[in-house]
Regions:
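Short hydrophobic alpha-helical segments enriched in small aliphatic residues
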Residues: 7, 17, 23-26, 37
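Methionine residue identity
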Residues: 1-2, 23
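Conserved N-proximal alpha/beta basic substrate-recognition cap immediately N-terminal to
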Residues: 59-187
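Extreme N-terminal starter segment of soluble prokaryotic enzymes
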Residues: 48-52
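Short, Lys/Arg-enriched N-terminal segments with co-localized hydrophobic residues
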Residues: 38-47
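Phosphate-binding site of ATP-dependent enzymes
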Residues: 68, 191-192, 199-203, 210-301, ...
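Redox-cofactor binding/interface segments in oxidoreductases and associated redox assembly factors
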Residues: 53, 131-132, 245
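ATP-dependent carboxylate activation and anion-phosphoryl transfer catalytic cores
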Residues: 37, 54-55, 61-64, 277, ...
């Protein structure tokens, strides 16, 4: 009851009236199960959901932090038939998207967290849903995989996230469609334009459009003698675009990852706080994670972006927010489920699987 009172006081009314719907995703203490959520989707008279997942090798994941693993646990709890795939399992034959799959079972066991069952060669359209959870880089191989998945989508398989939207929505450039929510942003490969932007703001962030985990992100302060070489490095002497944004001092309080499930924000986020002397909050760059309830500005940003994400078939998305500014929209393989669920009594994977089942209905 204490947990329920906490969520009601946090989300049950006020400016977020209607968010009492999150109550069904309260987890029973000491378990992974939602208190009021569905216990098993395979009930009498129901057809088993066949779920495929395309991911990096399950042999090398850290199950304590891996969001894909959390999704698999919830899918298994609901009685789904899970088909495991890696990128090299996908192929096209006579215009049909196909794959070599292995049936998969998982458990919360740090010594043995998965077991493969039978192997089969199937049409991807035989699956009800496929989770595309391959981590970046978003390169030509990733793009080719989306075309293969799209062939199954055309025959009725739900792909999470939608293949066309994975191609269309670059995680950094997509913020331009919500410019009123972002820092001042410049995307260019022109060195002079970058210098003028730097002179205007005096303290800027420069980053590539295809990076992840904080790689190749530079802070350039006033009179920094390294500006020219940084521009040359990121643009490869004017041949590639990069992004410039004014520096946000609020980064000291964390780069917040706000998860959005089929247009609806998860009521908690993970703030990635930079280590001393660092600009980047990314956990991969040494940042420290701290789970928090959403702030009013977090809610506002997520509510304004959510409908566009849902319309594009972007069912599971991670917004990056610094202070009250949107900096990135992560669509390829968003993370932080495990960290948030470890800190607060909510089943994010329950929200996701319910959204998937609603779309399949």
């Amino acid at each position: 009851m204490m947990i329920e009172r906490h969520l009601r006081s946090q989300f049950g009314g006020g400016q977020h009236a209607g968010t009492g719907a999150y109550m069904k995703y309260v987890r029973i203490p000491g378990t992974a199960q939602p208190r009021n959520g569905r216990q098993d989707s395979v009930q009498k008279g129901e057809k088993m959901i066949k779920l495929g997942i395309v991911m990096d090798p399950i042999t090398s994941i850290n199950i304590k932090k891996d969001s894909s693993f959390a999704m698999l646990l919830e899918a298994q709890r609901r009685g789904y038939e899970i088909h495991y795939m890696e990128m090299n399992d996908l192929y096209l034959r006579k215009g049909e998207g196909r794959a070599r799959t292995r049936l998969l079972s998982v458990e919360q066991n740090y010594d043995k967290w998965f077991e493969f069952g039978s192997e089969q060669d199937i049409a991807l359209a035989d699956l009800n849903v496929v989770l595309m959870r391959k981590d970046p880089p978003f390169d030509t191989e990733f793009i080719y995989a989306t075309y293969i998945l799209e062939r199954a989508e055309e025959k009725g398989t739900l792909i999470v996230n939608k293949p066309q939207s994975l191609r269309d929505c670059n995680e950094k450039l997509f913020t331009a469609w919500f410019a009123e929510l972002t820092p001042d942003t410049l995307v260019t490969r022109n060195a002079q334009q970058i210098r003028e932007f730097w002179q205007e703001h005096g303290d800027i962030i420069l980053k590539p459009l295809d990076g992840m985990g904080g790689a190749s992100i530079f802070r350039v302060k006033h009179e920094d003698p390294n500006l020219s070489v940084i521009i040359e490095t990121l643009t490869e002497h004017g041949n590639f675009y990069c992004m410039a944004q004014n520096y946000l001092p609020a980064i000291k309080d964390g780069d917040k990852r706000v998860l959005v499930v089929d247009g609806e924000p998860v009521p908690y986020c993970l703030a990635r706080i930079p280590k001393s002397g660092e600009t980047r909050g990314n956990l991969a760059a040494g940042g420290r994670g701290e789970a928090r309830p959403l702030s009013e500005s977090d809610w506002e940003i997520a509510r304004r972006v959510g409908p566009a994400l849902k319309a594009k078939g972007l069912i599971f998305v991670g917004l990056d927010i610094i202070g009250d500014k949107l900096t990135e929209i992560n669509v390829t393989s968003p993370t932080c489920i495990r960290e948030i669920e470890a800190a607060f009594p909510i089943s994010i994977t329950g929200m996701l699987m319910d959204a998937i089942e609603k779309r399949l209905a």
